[in-house]
A protein has these predicted regions:
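Catalytic alpha-helical scaffold of carbohydrate-active enzymes acting on polysaccharides/glycoconjugates
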Residues: 2-209, 234-257, 263-309
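A conserved mid-domain beta-alpha-beta active-site/ligand-binding segment of alpha/beta enzyme cores
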Residues: 212-245
Length: 309
C-alpha cells in the first residue's frame, strides 16, 4: 500500500492548460509583496547564523547564540526608516501592496502593523520568527503545526480576522505545510516558485490554491545578492513586466515583486520601486489583487484552467 502524501500537485505544462481569464480581462495580476520580518536577537545553543539565506551586511556572520548587532540592526533599519519610505511610495501611487508579517513582528513592532491596517492593505502571516524556519521541523510535524498555530493565533488577535493566505519565512515550507494551512482554513499557499499562474495543491485536508512567489523578481536577490544598480533594477522589472504582459494577451500571468524594507527602503533604491509602480500603473488591463482575492477567484474558475484529473 502506498502512503498518501500530505500534499501534492500534478505536472501540467503551460501548453496543456486552458486560457486563464482574469477579472476585467486583465493580462497581468501584479502583486507587490512587502515582507515585514523580525529576527530574534540570539537563540541559546544555536550555532548556525540567525539570518538564513543571507547575505550578511558584513562578512563572517556570528553563531546564532551570539548577538550580531551589525546584521540585526541592518534589518531593523527597515522597521525604523525603510518601511515608512516604502509606505509613502504606495500611498502616493494609490496601490495597495500585500504585506507579509512574522508573528513576532506583530508583537514587537505593533506600530508598523497598525499603519498597514489603517491603510486597509492585506496582511499575510509569514511564520513566527523569520529565523525559525519550518524546515527545522521537517521531521517533527507536531512541532511545525504548533508554530503555524501560534502564528495564526497571533495574527487573528492582532488583525481581528482569521488569516487566508500564508508565506513561509525564507519560503521554507515542508511537505506538510499546505495540509496544515488547509486544516486551519486558509485558501492560499505562496511558497512555490514554479509558475506564472495559480494552480491547485491537493492535500489530505482538501485543496488549497498556490499563488506563486518569485525569488528572481525580488529586491533581495536583485540588489543585496545580485548587486544590481538602481537603474539596472528598474530595467529588469520593466523587461519582466513587458514579457508577462505580452504573454497575458493569450492567458493571464502573475507577477510578484518581493520587497524588504531594509533593502528597497534605502534612499538610493527607493526610486526603483517608485519608477516601476508608475510603469505598471500606466499599462491597461492590469489587476492589482490581494493573494486572498486571487485564491478565491481561482477556486471558482480552476476547472476552466486545469480540469480535475
Amino acid at each position: 500500500m502506498t502512503d498518501v502524501p500530505p500534499s501534492s500537485y500534478p505536472y501540467v505544462p503551460l501548453p496543456d492548460r486552458g486560457p486563464l481569464r482574469f477579472p476585467g480581462g486583465a493580462r497581468v495580476a501584479m502583486i507587490f509583496t512587502i515582507n515585514m520580518e523580525y529576527w530574534e536577537m540570539a537563540r541559546p545553543g544555536q550555532k548556525e547564523p540567525l539570518f538564513p539565506g543571507g547575505p550578511a551586511t558584513i562578512p563572517h556572520a556570528l553563531p546564532g547564540d551570539v548577538a550580531d548587532f551589525a546584521n540585526w540592526t541592518w534589518r531593523e533599519y527597515g522597521q525604523r526608516v525603510g518601511i515608512w519610505r516604502v509606505m509613502e511610495v504606495f500611498d502616493r501611487a494609490g496601490i495597495a501592496p500585500s504585506c507579509t508579517m512574522n508573528g513576532l513582528l506583530a508583537m514587537e513592532r505593533r506600530r508598523i502593523v497598525d499603519a498597514v491596517k489603517e491603510r486597509g492593505w492585506e496582511l499575510v502571516p509569514h511564520n513566527w520568527a523569520q529565523n525559525d524556519l519550518l524546515t527545522y521541523y521537517a521531521h517533527d510535524p507536531a512541532g511545525e503545526r504548533a508554530v503555524i498555530r501560534r502564528t495564526l493565533d497571533a495574527y487573528e488577535k492582532i488583525v481581528g480576522r482569521p488569516a487566508k493566505a500564508w508565506l513561509s519565512s525564507a519560503i521554507r515550507g515542508t511537505r506538510e505545510t499546505p495540509a496544515f494551512l488547509k486544516e486551519f482554513g486558509l485558501v492560499a499557499y505562496c511558497d512555490y516558485l514554479n509558475d506564472d499562474q495559480p494552480y491547485l495543491i491537493s492535500t489530505i485536508n482538501g485543496p488549497i490554491v498556490c499563488v506563486p512567489y518569485s525569488n528572481d523578481v525580488n529586491d533581495f536577490n536583485m540588489f543585496a545578492r545580485g548587486s544590481l544598480t538602481t537603474r539596472d533594477g528598474v530595467d529588469m522589472l520593466k523587461l519582466c513586466f513587458d514579457q508577462l504582459y505580452a504573454e497575458g494577451a493569450e492567458t493571464g500571468r502573475i507577477m510578484n515583486l518581493g520587497l524588504h524594507p531594509h533593502v528597497i527602503g534605502q534612499p538610493h533604491r527607493i526610486a526603483a520601486l517608485r519608477d516601476f509602480i508608475d510603469y505598471a500603473k500606466a499599462a491597461s488591463n492590469v489587476w492589482f489583487p490581494t493573494r486572498e482575492e486571487i485564491a478565491e477567484w481561482y477556486l471558482a474558475h480552476h476547472a476552466e484552467h486545469i480540469p480535475p484529473r
